[in-house]
């Protein structure tokens, strides 16, 4: 197939074209990004250095924090730098790389959240066999499945996009490169391809969301004969995960489970699931988890002690 395109770069509209608001955007998203990096890396360091946090749940949480770090980094730095640029330019290859990064890390996180729900199910419904079932080798395999799934999803999406004829215009009505805004710039009819993107992206969101719902329905049914105290204790194990699932899945389903249409609210939704959710994940897991908070305090005391020495 011959690659036909005249466009070598794209111009991003950004979040706002108001100079004052662009300065506000710079400050706000720089702070958000710094909190995201520090929070997620703190989780990674805390779990990897603490012997008390060696269960499969924390193994998965480490990988979730790593994914959140790189996922946010696929769009936040460009948005921050562009806040001071009158003309927000991104090369064709850079645009495709950004779209690819967004989809590989986003899809991997979706699958990993589903894996974490299955871990939660085993912990609550089969506690006596938990360590036997959730062996370290199985945990590694499940994380590998998440990454392979994300890789296949993103690769299929981008291979269909990179060969499309972009003849102009080259102005993307977004602050980052994403498939739906890009498809609006293609010189041919993209209705069929748009349906494929919706099916591919929407399917991975919806399928994993349904698996999550089924997992929690089974968990709730298994707890119906337990005491109220027992139910509360069991559910507290997974409530943080439920919050993260809702925060991440609802915006993704809203954006991708529809035809090739872009709405004014899409940019705000994209900010939420690419920057706000990765920032909130460490907060959600830390505030509701006494073991993580205790490990962070021990890590901090160890650092203070070493500094004093």
From Swiss-Prot:
Its main location: membrane. It is a multi-pass membrane protein. The keyword Disulfide bond applies. Residues 1-23, 78-98, 157-193, 257-267 are extracellular. The keyword NAD does not apply. GO terms for cellular component: plasma membrane. InterPro entries: GPCR_Rhodpsn (IPR000276), GPCR_Rhodpsn_7TM (IPR017452), Olfact_rcpt (IPR000725), Olfactory_Receptors (IPR050427). Disulfide bonds join 95-187. One of its GO terms (molecular function) is olfactory receptor activity. It is found in: Cell membrane. Residues 48-55, 119-137, 218-233, 288-309 are cytoplasmic. Glycans are attached at residue 6. Pfam families: 7tm_4. Keywords: Cell membrane, Disulfide bond, G-protein coupled receptor, Glycoprotein, Membrane, Olfaction, Receptor, Sensory transduction, Transducer, Transmembrane, Transmembrane helix. The chain crosses the membrane at residues 24-47, 56-77, 99-118, 138-156, 194-217, 234-256, 268-287. Belongs to the G-protein coupled receptor 1 family. Odorant receptor. This is Olfactory receptor 4C12. The gene is OR4C12.
